[in-house]
Curated annotation (Swiss-Prot):
Gene3D superfamilies: 1.20.1280.50. The lineage of its organism: Eukaryota, Viridiplantae, Streptophyta, Embryophyta, Tracheophyta. This is Putative F-box protein At1g33010. It comes from the Eukaryota. PANTHER family: BNAA05G37150D PROTEIN-RELATED, F-BOX ASSOCIATED UBIQUITINATION EFFECTOR FAMILY PROTEIN. InterPro entries: F-box-assoc_dom_typ3, F-box-assoc_interact_dom, F-box-like_dom_sf, F-box_dom. It holds the Pfam family F-box. SUPFAM superfamilies: F-box domain. Residues 308-339 are annotated as: Disordered. Residues 4-50 form the F-box domain.
Amino acid sequence: MNKGNTLDSIPTDLILEIFSRLSAKSVGRLRCLSKLWRKGEWFFFSSLQPQNLYEKPFLVVAADFHMKFSEDMSHDIYSYASGLIYFPKMLIENEKSGAIRVICNPITGQYAILPKLITLQAARSFLGFDPIDNQFKVLLVNNDIVNNDMDILTLGIGELMSEKLKFIEAKCFFALDDVQLINYKGKLGGISWNNHEVAPVELSMWVLEDVEKQEWSKNVYILPKNVVPNNWLHAAGVTVEGDIVFSEAVVSNPFDVFYFNPEKNTLQHVETHCNHEVFDDENLVNIFVDHVEDLKFDVMKPTYAATSIRPTEQKHKPTSTETSMSRKDHQVRTIDQPQQDRCTFESINNKFDVMCLLDDD
């Protein structure tokens, strides 16, 4: 088996053997990425997500350490999508081109290097997964106020074609300082909450009910102050059951995670314990939910890298596609990028192909 690049010393075949012997329930976990302030290092942990959240008023789980990321990474924003983590600036041994954009599988340690772009080198970028076309995409947004062009990198295999993108107006967010977009049961949503020490946590949630008419619904919830500490909270996302997950923005031992279900108006407190030095200090932390449940292994195979909804019958070659567009006219141009460093991403997907057997249990 082609291992591809790896950040980890554990052999790929051994990891595949371990995962193939586990049930899907055993693998479904809450992921945690913690940054050690004093050294600039990143640590990756996971803990089992409780299957029956609301049977008990209080739950305790354990977190397991998986791997450590390079301390030479930039402090720039990273992002997470369907089991992969994207770092916009990472220094890798034997790479002479300086900081590069990398997509990494934090469980196996494998990574894929994205092609360099001449334009938008200073742009902010984010990783996402398109479940319709089964593609991973990286969005690059220019920081320049005058030139607000955007680039989209699509990972996969296929022919180059074009697509039309449509923007959704969200005027309900304009007056807010901070809104986090979420996937709420298949609908686009946004949440905002106050981080004040005096008042209880007030959570506002908007859901796009009609895409064509661009109609949003809004609900406001008050989280009980005696359960949720009113210090700085981080929203991890939404589980497949519709629970909004919050955690403390700074790690502690024990580490508190909160599940709030808007439909049932229920709140669950989960206490996470870990025997690791990272949890002993006040380090930054971000968590991700439904690591396996959101990871559709069967659709993470290399797919058509172009933006075509209907794949052609021709023989396909591996590509990495750059799609550039402007907010003003929504026009799209597509540029074929060189085939460098593509085999590493295929090896990541090969590992997912084997792990998809877990869904059959």
